[in-house]
Amino acid sequence: MRNILYVQIIFILIIAFVTPIKSYAFNVAKHISNVNGLTNNSVNCILEDEEHTIWIGTWDGLNAYNGREITTFRYSKNNPNSISNNVIRQIIECKGSLWIATDNGVNRLDKRTRQITRYYLRTDNKVPNQEKSFILGKSAAGDIICLIKGLGFFVYNDSEDEFNPINTDFASHVKDYSVSDSDHVLFLLNNGSSVYLSYNLLVNGGKQDDLRTVGIHTPVDKIFLSKGRFILNKDNRIFLLNPDFTVSQDIELDSNKPVSQAILAEDNMFVSFIEGGCINYDLRKNTFTYLNELSNQLS
């Protein structure tokens, strides 16, 4: 199900990237939509790469914005150097390439040559019948792993240029996951439980008995990773975790709207909502303000 239809994308640079918090008085907003060349106004993911190109994954293709123009990448039946599917779910940068999860396969895009390699990871060649069937992760060393719903976890072997299966016994219970810079893997299970183990243990065949429970006693709906910190969400509650997976802050938001994203920036956390709007939560003062620069149609 689509999270939100964007009428326009607004890049508040201090939120999306690394501009200091003290620059709030000088926010710069850039409006981009399909009028400017974006393939679709419904956006699933955004990534700024090392060259500061903005990559935008939509429901109808991948877009690269360099500050002046938009380059688009879309599936073409007659072009093997096109992406495997136009619904872009996730973008990860690693070693000069972008790894792109779509609704039908994973793609590796060489940023220098623009060569695209497709990895379907399915033997039946059928399009998955559920959304977000491919979920990517990256280890601290730059290893790429992928969860394929119904098939399990896979790790990319660069010398063989293929994904090899990881022998685990709990993949069918995983709804979502994320890998931190310290090589801890947080899993959101189908029953709402949140558990974790080390990346090294996962790729070496970690089992369900190896999973450790996060220090909260309520099921959650979403997990986020920002600035090396895990963030969990259930309804209007946000749980910011410590490195040892205990709860650092339990935040109750003054809104019943479903959360779409949570991003850390110094002592602040920016929280956006699926139905539109965004707040800046001060983690030291435990206060928040609404960002009036953002249209209520954006999340």
Model-identified regions with their sequence ranges:
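Carboxylate-rich, polar loop motifs that coordinate divalent cations or form catalytic acidic clusters
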Residues: M1-S299
